[in-house]
Structures are given as C-alpha cells and as structure tokens.
C-alpha cells in the first residue's frame, strides 16, 4: 500500500536521531505551510520530510537556537522523547512475528514478579487501602497504557532518582519496582499514559532475547535501518548540534523552557538509562 507521510519535527520536541541524510531540497511544499508560524515566532523551527515512494522533498525552516539565530539544519540532533515507545513496539512486534511472544500472554510468563499485583483503592488521610488485582496483566495491556501503571514508577521511590529519561533505573530494575508498587486500577479496565508500561515491555524483550533491550534494538532495528546517530547517549560532538527546547503558546512566540528537566539534564551522563518509554 502506498503511503504518504509528512514528518514535521518541531524544535520544541528534541530528537537525538539526526544523521547525514537527504540534503535540504530547497523546495516549497512545507516551507509555504510553516514559514508563517516561524515568522510569527510561534514555531522556532522545523525539519520536514515529504515521503511518497521515497523521499520527495525535505526542507529546513526556522532556527535551532532562536536567540543566536542559528538556522536549523538536516544534521541537527533532536530528542525523540515518547516516540521511543514506537521503537519498543517494533522490538515486541519482531518477537511476535518470530512466534516467541503473544500480545495476550501474561506478563508474569516472562517476569514472574508480576504474578500478584495490588490495586490501590483510595487514600484517607494517611491510610491507603488496596485489593489484590483480579485481572491478569497481559503484554498488550502494558503496551497500550491499560496496565494501571503511573507515568513514571521509579520516581515514586526515594532510593531511585527520577525515572525514564530523567534518570531513573535500568529496564529490569524499573520493572521490578513497578511489580512491587501498587497499580492505579484493575488491569485492562482504564487507560493512563505510562512510560513505565513501555519499560516493562522492554524488560520482556530482555527476558526473551537474553540481551539488554537497547543492544537488541540497535542490532535488530537501528543498524539495519542505517540509523547510526540514534542512541540513548549522544556524543559531545552530537550535542553541539542539538536544537534548543521550546514550548508553544497559542498566539504567542515560543519560549525557551530554561527550567525544563529534559533540557537541563546531562544527556550522556552515567545516570542516564535506556528508557524504552522516552530515552532516544
């Protein structure tokens, strides 16, 4: 089936994926659509790729750094944030295709610590009440955000700083913390956006393959696609090409989010772990 994909990567959503790929084609399809937003200041900058049976058009619009008037370029690096979840989905899908996994398998088949879960009923003053989960947690549930896990589970523990892209813990440790923590509702009954669930999915990949999730991702997905600059720990050279992080406001210029943890954190420090929920 033919696909037409327009990918707009705006500079308020950093992505550590840039590589020397197609050059700016200097064509006008996206530029005509996006330039007014750059001119008004609502959009700091963007890279567009128009794809139909191959790359038809690429265009760079605006700035990687508004204050310094540094133009955005095809080789700038961005942080993907939650788009990392899709990469985890690909690794799961590969195992499903190979017959090594079913989406309706219990998570406890691969991670026994999830066999018994506790649901938090509520909290009155300092007293919290729980009940043993009645529903079986499946692989599908942790991937589609219906497992009952909060956005960042490791941030709830005082012995682990942050969670996911903000520090957190290795995949298997994050999964173990999640299994030992109360969930928000019965698995499969509601939905809440969760990096934790995706990290649990990555932990399942580690169990089946016997490899660290990030190494499996690199070997089976990133390297075959030629995504040489896509990784959890960018080099100092890559960081010199990163775009600044901006927030958008309706009818107002984009503002640099100076106090934003994602912008201020050391991207390649030793405490940064390969979160499947938001690490690339």
Where do the PLM segments sit?
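Alpha-helix N-cap and coil->helix boundary residues
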Residues: 29, 102-106, 212-217
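Short, surface-exposed loop or secondary-structure junction motifs
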Residues: 58, 118-280
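Bacterial Sec-dependent N-terminal signal peptides
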Residues: 1-23
